[in-house]
């Protein structure tokens, strides 16, 4: 990915001054692999010690030519400039998986590429100088899985929805990292129809899932609501959809969520009506052949920053939105200096190399 300087005025047109929440631009993006500098979506990313790590992802260097990447990159955490270097390679190019932290390592879970979906789990560790990644293959998942959401509560990993063994699913896979058995199993199923590209978060033994879509012809769905799984009792509780700064119910499909204390934050995602019109095959808003040709603003990706109060079990009033957050397929890495919001797409097939820090 090349380093692109974007005028700050373009980033903050929608910022709401009444909120303490903010977004600030960070310069620097990986550029070693040809085409990567254009920006990628659906990459793996996390923090190891003082370093940000990102890997894989995909983009369209030329129209219609979707490319997947295998590079593993690291950069020392910094609020203004990230100096990325290639520190290793994935065993194969991959995107649309998930990342969770595991001590001084990261786990890259599932995903897919142009050839197949993956059931692999890799442990990524950096050496002391942060210039070499060690990649270790762990026990396989029980099925291939991609476009799912991952959440972690204590030593427990939960993978919700996505495509499992090539089919849209609502299953929740569970793995305990310290039980010594190394087994994954289906712990629960989110009520209702499958959810591809949902968001998820976990805290205090509860797993939260919102959004996601299901392609099924005229019966296709773009979910706005969510559910909370009590992992002790196995019971599900229905959750309301988030609402924009304008009070409109929105979807988190294609967005991202993360936890901070007793709150869940979420941002990004597609516009429900426009996306549903396309995946259902109706194309009432625009002709099918013109769908990918519209300007970025037409797709109305969400730039809202949502806050869910775990204790009150409700969304707080949304007070902040920014065009820099209006993406799908971006990833987040929470750190002590803020949450890095990395890459993603601005519209179908158009990626961004922009990284910002979100202050909640």
Question: For the regions a protein language model found, what residue spans apply to each?
Answer:
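Kelch-like beta-propeller repeat domains
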Residues: 21-360
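Bacterial Sec-dependent N-terminal signal peptides
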Residues: 1-23
């Amino acid at each position: 990915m090349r380093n692109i300087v974007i005028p700050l005025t373009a980033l903050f047109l929608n910022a709401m001054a009444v909120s303490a929440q903010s977004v600030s631009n960070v310069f620097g993006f990986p550029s070693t692999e040809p085409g990567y500098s254009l920006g990628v979506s659906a990459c793996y990313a996390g923090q190891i010690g003082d370093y940000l790590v990102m890997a894989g992802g995909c983009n369209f260097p030329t129209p219609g030519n979707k490319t997947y990447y295998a590079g593993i990159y690291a950069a020392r955490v910094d609020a203004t400039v990230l100096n990325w270097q290639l520190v290793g390679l994935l065993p194969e190019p991959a995107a649309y998986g998930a990342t969770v932290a595991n001590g001084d390592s990261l786990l890259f879970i599932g995903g897919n590429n142009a050839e197949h979906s993956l059931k692999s789990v890799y442990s990524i560790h950096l050496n002391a100088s942060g210039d070499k990644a060690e990649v270790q293959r762990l026990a396989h998942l029980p099925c291939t899985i991609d476009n799912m959401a991952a959440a972690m509560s204590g030593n427990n990993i939960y993978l919700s929805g996505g495509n499992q063994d090539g089919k849209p699913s609502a299953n929740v896979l569970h793995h305990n990292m310290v039980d010594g058995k190394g087994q994954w199993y289906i712990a629960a199923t989110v009520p209702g129809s499958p959810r591809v590209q949902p968001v998820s978060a976990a805290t205090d033994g509860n797993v939260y899932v919102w959004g996601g879509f299901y392609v099924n012809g005229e019966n296709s769905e773009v979910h706005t609501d969510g559910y909370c799984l009590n992992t002790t009792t196995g019971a599900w509780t229905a959750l309301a959809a988030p609402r924009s700064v304008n009070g409109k119910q929105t979807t988190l499909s294609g967005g991202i969520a993360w936890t901070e204390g007793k709150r869940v934050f979420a941002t990004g995602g597609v516009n429900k009506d426009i996306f549903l019109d396309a995946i259902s095959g109706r194309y009432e808003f625009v002709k099918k052949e013109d769908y990918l040709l519209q300007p970025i603003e037409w797709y109305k990706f969400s730039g809202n920053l949502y806050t869910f109060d775990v204790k009150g079990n409700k969304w707080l009033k949304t007070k902040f939105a920014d065009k820099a957050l209006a993406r799908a397929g971006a990833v987040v890495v929470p750190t002590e200096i803020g949450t890095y919001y990395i890459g993603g797409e601005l519209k179908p097939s158009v990626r961004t190399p922009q990284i910002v820090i979100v202050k909640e």
